[in-house]
Amino acid sequence: MNKLKSRYKVVIYDCDGVILDSIESNYVFYNRVMDFLGRPEIDRDNDDAKRVLHTYSFNDVMEYFFVGDPRREDAFNFAKTIHYRDLMPYMRMEDGFVSALDQLKGHTSLAICTNRATSMDMIIEDFGLTGYFEYVMTASQVTNPKPHPEPLLKVLDYFKIAPEDALFIGDGEVDMQAANSAGVPFISYKSHLPALARLQHHAEIVQHVFSNL
């Protein structure tokens, strides 16, 4: 493995849907807010609602569901009382993720760029990911979260690299849009979004990173 050469100086991961299968935890979180306000649960057949709650930042999701609701501030305040660790039982790590990190570490720098705000440090600790990522960019660190390119541009600035020297792996439109706007090569993970490659397993990502140009 030491003889392998990475195509990229930095590999950047989205969190939800790439590192973690967390869709159920997102439904649980926002349905608790709905229940607090006496509103019906989110329709799981509503693809647009699923897309928003799974990929957008907390503030953007709350605006999506509660814009115009006179209890909007109550919804925000209650949501902030829900602790991440209450949702952890509804999350699981994507198969093969740690193995992929073990293969990549030492050959390329690793980073995270997520629309999560305050829970990422706990996720890294609770899922045994401490020590893998040199830089973690969250929605709380930027003025404009994904789909704006600001988070990815800040990652590039941290590593002092050109956009083409990074690879961003995401599963949502916000990831694709941010990557395109920042000029960063994009891999679509378990989705059919337009991308440099559409891959289903983390082992395939490793193969791509070490493949010949």
What is each stretch, according to the model?
Residues 113-114:
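Conserved phosphate-coupling serine/threonine residues in phosphotransfer and NTP-handling enzymes
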Residues 13, 110, 166-168:
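Short glycine- and Lys/Arg-enriched binding-loop motifs that mark or flank ligand-binding interfaces
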Residues 109-110, 185:
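Residue-level detector of anion-binding/catalytic polar loops
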Residues 1-9, 117, 121-213:
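Asp-based, Mg2+/Mn2+-dependent phosphohydrolase catalytic module
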Residues 3-98, 102-106:
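N-terminal helical cap/lid subdomain that shapes the substrate entry/recognition surface
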Residues 106-107, 182:
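Conserved dinucleotide-binding and phosphotransfer motif residues
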